């Protein structure tokens, strides 16, 4: 049996001590049997933690988890913050118990789930870092390479044809040897072009040459790398075509006749869901089949899966060793990528099958969207076209208690329109907006600079992996 390190125990105990009394009072005010049981469990949890009776925490953790997680799944969220607080304290009890039992995989599983659900990172990340390093040292792989993408399986003829009148400008970075380290006359000239023509004017561009030699370009192309080193880690996966599209379909169905809605139980048009999965299950069930698909630009919704906008770098910090920050970002001097929750956001990973779709929206941070593996189509509209884009407010995610927490960068303004196959009779103002859009296809090593406030629509044309480097100019 392992001892639980004081550096982990003390901050966890302080959180429980400071929260459990108020949480218990809030639970009792709900006046139902489950809430009453949670209150009893939390009092037992505090007593056992205070007495360091960690070997008795298993049943308490399981009881709290069952009561809170079932409510989340049934209701699509927690109606009261005390339920989230109960869940988090129960998870911390589970982490403590399984750590002392020396069960590395189970402890990391609970840590991952807690991380995704918004438990305090300062409590989780030190434990996750210790255990993930132990897991890596005990993991060896003799399995053959599993390519995320093979160009012979990519049907380039099905890619969108880029209108030359709407192409995003391409600039170079690190064209010659001097650029490799962000120094030398060639690089300074390249950076001057970027800063004067794009950064200062808030104009999108594609940057070529900088990321080509990042280790992840080849390393992450092998799905076996993720299977061998991180296969048991829990991640949030979006299944089916994008959530907002599904909500629109649901609203339309609710307006149909009684005869039509009577058949809704067999209607597969509402096909978006989110699920916590082991990374290996996501790869084996979705990524590998998609990599073998010779027309992944048209992957049907039931086969679409997306690890979208997730803080996988924080969760698996060893991934930091495989890439660099874009040179232009390092050189600006007046810009910074935020790396902590207090300061902002760290680089995020987007990993998915072909035909994942991100509806048109804008972010409040500038972004270097870097394509690592595969291909993506991106269409951009400037902020001055906002009145022509048929934006709607996504009211459904106002609750902070959804299965996967909301993005810090996504705005409420979003468009449900299919921008690649537009019904101009229904959306005539898009004829005006379409005089001003720009577009591109990103391939491995391409970096797209997207200024804050620019609307963007993104669709993967193959299995794909991208990195977002959001930053804010001082």
UniProtKB/Swiss-Prot annotation:
Q: This chain belongs to which protein, by name?
A: JmjC domain-containing protein F
Q: Which domain of life is it from?
A: Eukaryota
Region (Disordered) residue ranges read 247-269
Which species is this UniProt entry from? Dictyostelium discoideum (Social amoeba)
Which Gene3D superfamilies does the annotation name? Cupin (2.60.120.650)
Q: Which GO terms describe its molecular function?
A: 2-oxoglutarate-dependent dioxygenase activity
Q: Where is the JmjC domain?
A: 305-474
Q: Where is the composition biased (Low complexity)?
A: 251-261
Spell out the SUPFAM superfamilies in the cross-references: Clavaminate synthase-like
Q: Name one Pfam family in it.
A: Cupin_8
SMART domains per UniProt: JmjC
